[in-house]
Swiss-Prot record:
Entry-linked SUPFAM superfamilies: FAD/NAD(P)-binding domain
Biological source species: Mus musculus
Cross-link (Glycyl lysine isopeptide (Lys-Gly) (interchain with G-Cter in SUMO)): K492
Protein name per UniProt: Dimethylaniline monooxygenase [N-oxide-forming] 2
Domain of life the protein comes from: Eukaryota
Amino acid sequence: MAKKVVVIGAGVSGLISLKCCVDEGLEPTCFERTEDIGGLWRFKENVEDGRASIYRSVITNTSKEMSCFSDFPMPEDFPNFLHNSKLLEYFRIFAKKFDLLKYIQFQTTVISVKKRPDFASSGQWEVYTQSNGKEQRTVFDAVMVCSGHHIQPHLPLKSFPGIERFRGQYFHSREYKHPVGFEGKRILVVGIGNSAADIASELSKTAAQVFVSTRHGSWVMSRISEDGYPWDMVFHTRFSSMLRNVLPRTVVKWMMEQQMNRWFNHENYGLVPQNKYLMKEPVLNDDLPSRLLYGAIKVKTRVKELTETAVVFEDGTVEEDVDIIVFATGYTFSFSFLEDSLVKVEDNRVSLYKAMFPPHLEKPTLACIGLIQPLGSIFPTVELQARWATRVFKGLCSLPSETTMMADIVERNEKRVNLFGKSQSQILQTNYVDYLDELALEIGAKPDFVSLFFKDPKLAVKLYFGPCNSYQYRLVGPGQWEGARNAILTQKQRILKPLKTRTLQSSDSAPVSFLLKILGLLAVVLAFFFQLQGF
């Protein structure tokens, strides 16, 4: 008899969890409190309590080839970075392809999840839900928590003396939808994350003046990298990940600084991070530097206090006649339907084995999917989490002892603090490629590069020096996909396809460029040789 699994939430984590359950022969039921799928990525004009909220102009920060599910590439004509509506379209295509909607009960809220009295032996759960005013209790063999962590706004008003007397408008960034109504205003955006940079850049096109207040600064990257390819297809390779792991910290820091300053000098723009040794997530924004050059945005230090109409900053400067303050200060999270004894959240910290499993449960039948913030795409990350969780539920994978899991949690937290710092915004941060490989190893889906080099050297080179995308984890192990190799070898054409909208005559510029590079290299070698000969 198939084990029954409850999936809480029908966002990206919930959808892929449903598919993984079906792939493993489990019987899933998904409870979604709203009327549709998509979670965070489904834009709505109004903010709704208990639901993630985005602004109309949001586009992905990770490219389509790095963000698709491992056995379902995005259509080749999709743009490389997707508007939220386009990403939602992909989710709909995905859900239809694998017939997932039949497992979802919409407008159904999970009230509580409790252990059954015989949990120590059965591992079962009682799930209480509410729909159309009626409550219902259902027993499940396992639970997948996919409710997200971008719902409860973090609004630290106590850190802003004088906010109670400020006459202007202030709100959290989750309430921002579009720039209409902000024309001609003087606006302060607090924070320097992706949302802060997006909102500040968008508002600066019609506002009288926009200020951005940041405590620590941030690296800012373009989505466009070398030769015009998406940034993450160049940044996230196994080779570059290996270098960041084995080289001395000072060398990695220097390399990172050089790479980040290649676009523009962050110190000149007032954005250089306070602690450059930390591998904090960079801001992805193609507009911010130009808006700073135009003077439409001005970078300020931390807010010291507010008056009725002005903002006083820590460096002593004052900006008068501020109309609006947007707090892009992140989110907190909790699980109101879970008892603290199951998953306890303290100061936005939670103790989960590999960011998924509560270590103290007698039976490993509850997993949190998506409670992580990788330095890369979240979509392949949650997919591997779901693949592992469903195999644990099925008994095909096992977890170590509670002592071992707790030791791993402590070690992982120490590494996180060492790499990313103690800031609240970095609490869920993790290295991208390392974490993917860690999960893949648990289910036997990590490629063996040594054997692959002898069997298929062309593919091995692509895997090691090319983008580390999700297709790699369908080459071996459970859930192999026969199209994985071809998807890896043809990703370049899917990147270029949406850009080929103008027919061009063939050009010899590429061969000439290549020849010039060869001649230049030859000239350097000859110059070095002649220098040795004393010419």
